[in-house]
Amino acid sequence: MKNNRTFLEKLLEGSEVEWKPLDEVANIVNNARKPVKSSLRVSGNIPYYGANNIQDYVEGYTHEGEFVLIAEDGSASLENYSIQWAVGKFWANNHVHVVNGKEKLNNRFLYHYLTNMNFIPFLAGKERAKLTKAKLQQIPIPIPPLSVQTEIVKILDALTALTSELTSELTSELTSELILRQKQYEYYREKLLNIDEMNKVIELGDVGPVRMCKRILKNQTASSGDIPFYKIGTFGKKPDAYISNELFQEYKQKYSYPKKGDILISASGTIGRTVIFDGENSYFQDSNIVWIDNDETLVLNKYLYHFYKIAKWGIAEGGTIQRLYNDNLKKVKISIPPLKEQHRIVSILDKFETLTNSITEGLPLAIEQSQKRYEYYRELLLNFS
């Protein structure tokens, strides 16, 4: 913290920093704001701003110049309150305060400072938090010399531009790499898993019986609780329903329940989506989520996992299917090489899948790291307290 202050002190060179209420150092130009229903907007090239972003492009404008837009209500996040930068001609609706600095306050300095500020103490209301004009006017703003404001803006703008450039480059490069790796994975998957006359061909019903969990009634679920309950809409995603541990333990003992490593399959909606069951306590919607009870004497579960991605579920090309019935599932043919060869194939396909996933996960991570770098320096440069 000492180094942080020293860095800022070097910029200040002994100059004092005044704190002023926002309405003393900035203009609040809300009078021209005008909300327009989407059905009444005339399409054009002028950005139409709402609380969080540009909502449309219209003809006409309410403001022209450089302004900071602060959500009045409807901010997507209260912790990271919505602050936008508007330049040129634009249209502002009544969900944003429109502000620009007076002679002692650099507009971009105000923008960066507000993006680093905690707005929660200034908000009124619970269900739809609101920043009233009266509270906005009271927000304390640090006023270092304009030369210091300009230098801080120069540094933070450079970091913002670097983050944007890096995001664009990473997205372009990694998307191309992702497409290439995905195609490689699909090529080898098709080559290694398709029907081979040299291998034994069986039906999935020969691998093991089709299983599903016991039906869970709506009144047995809650929005929070002990055991996540996955429905077809949340399969492979975040659960939005839960069941009690008592019910889970009872049903787990009495009825079918997957083993760790079993491959769960979606039997409605998008047919054939898969999840490798990790063994964690959870429950799954009956008939919509099924699995083959596989003892792995004939087929490895991981081999099934990769096979399901190319399986033909008994429908014509271009056709649709509302449900994968057990009989359809059991009749799907699969080529099974010896277990040793299955291990080799799984090893190859796992590597391709890992490479593909590493790009998918790496892109947001790299962007997040760049954003954190900007936030670190923003905090360092704007911590006048």
UniProtKB/Swiss-Prot annotation:
GO terms for biological process: DNA restriction-modification system. One of its GO terms (molecular function) is DNA binding. Keywords: DNA-binding, Repeat, Restriction system. Signal peptide: none annotated. InterPro entries: Restrct_endonuc_typeI_TRD, Restrct_endonuc_typeI_TRD_sf, Type-I_RE_S_subunit. A putative specificity subunit for a type I restriction enzyme; the corresponding endonuclease and methylase subunits have multiple frameshifts and are probably not expressed. Contains two DNA recognition domains, each specifying recognition of one of the two defined components of the target sequence. Belongs to the type-I restriction system S methylase family. This is Putative type I restriction enzyme specificity subunit S.HindORF215P. It comes from Haemophilus influenzae (strain ATCC 51907 / DSM 11121 / KW20 / Rd). The lineage of its organism: Bacteria, Pseudomonadati, Pseudomonadota, Gammaproteobacteria, Pasteurellales.
